[in-house]
Curated annotation (Swiss-Prot):
Name of the gene this protein is made from: SMO2-2
Annotated domain remarks: The histidine box domains may contain the active site and/or be involved in metal ion binding.
Organism: Arabidopsis thaliana (Mouse-ear cress)
Catalytic activity: 4,4-dimethyl-5alpha-cholest-7-en-3beta-ol + 6 Fe(II)-[cytochrome b5] + 3 O2 + 5 H(+) = 4alpha-carboxy-4beta-methyl-5alpha-cholest-7-ene-3beta-ol + 6 Fe(III)-[cytochrome b5] + 4 H2O; 24-methylidenelophenol + 6 Fe(II)-[cytochrome b5] + 3 O2 + 5 H(+) = 4alpha-carboxy-ergosta-7,24(24(1))-dien-3beta-ol + 6 Fe(III)-[cytochrome b5] + 4 H2O
Residues covered by the Fatty acid hydroxylase domain: 113-247
Main subcellular location: endoplasmic reticulum
Motif (Histidine box-1): 127-131
SS bond partners: none
Entry protein name: Methylsterol monooxygenase 2-2
Amino acid sequence: MASFVESGWQYLVTHFSDFQLACIGSFLLHESVFFLSGLPFIFLERQGFLSKYKIQTKNNTPAAQGKCITRLLLYHFSVNLPLMLASYPVFRAMGMRSSFPLPSWKEVSAQILFYFIIEDFVFYWGHRILHSKWLYKNVHSVHHEYATPFGLTSEYAHPAEILFLGFATIVGPALTGPHLITLWLWMVLRVLETVEAHCGYHFPWSLSNFLPLYGGADFHDYHHRLLYTKSGNYSSTFVYMDWIFGTDKGYRRLKTLKENGDMKQT
C-alpha cells in the first residue's frame, strides 16, 4: 500500500507544480468527492429508495435541488477557488509541502485527530454566533432555506458564511503546516462527514451508531428542522461541545421521547 501511494505521489509531483497541486488539485479533489458523495442522495430522495431510513417524510422538489446545485457551482468557482488560490502563500509560509518524503501514518493520524478537535471547537462557537438574531437573519438563514437537508446542502450557504465557518476547517492545517497529502486526506474526511450529516438518512450502518460522540445525520437534521435562532445542535463532527454547554437538550429530550414510543417520527 505504501509503495502504491508513493508511486502515485511521485507521478503527481513529477508532472505538476506545487502550486498546481495545492490549488487546482485541491479544488478538483474537493469537487469530485463532494458531488460524488452528495448526488446519490438526490437520486434516493427522488426515487424513494431506502425511504424507511429517511429522517423526514418531506421531500425537496427537483426545482429546489436544481437551485442548490446551481448556487453551489457559482459559489465554488467564485468563492472557494479564489480562496484556495489566495491562501496558498499562507500555507507555504506555515510549512506546507508536497515533496518527498511522505509523512508517516502516525504523523498523519495525529494531525488529522488534532484537526478534528480544533475544528469542532472553532466551528461550534462560530456556528452558535451565526444563530444570533442579526447574523441568522442576514447570513445563516441562507443555509437554513432547506429545512429538509440532503447531502449537497451541506455547502449551500451565504458567501460570508463560507469564509467565516471555513476558517474552522483550515485553522488546524494552518497551524501545523502539513504535507499536502495530509491536507487532502483531511479535506476528503471533512467533506464526507458534512455530506453525511446533511444527507437526511439515518442508516443502520451510519457512523453515529458505532462511533461515540459522533453526531451524524440524525443529530444535525434536528438542527435544520427547527428554524429558530436557538435550535441547538451546533457541533460539527463530534457532539461533546453541545453536551458540555447544554445546547443539545432539546434534541436529547426528543430522542428520549422517540425511544420510549411517546411520539412518531415526522
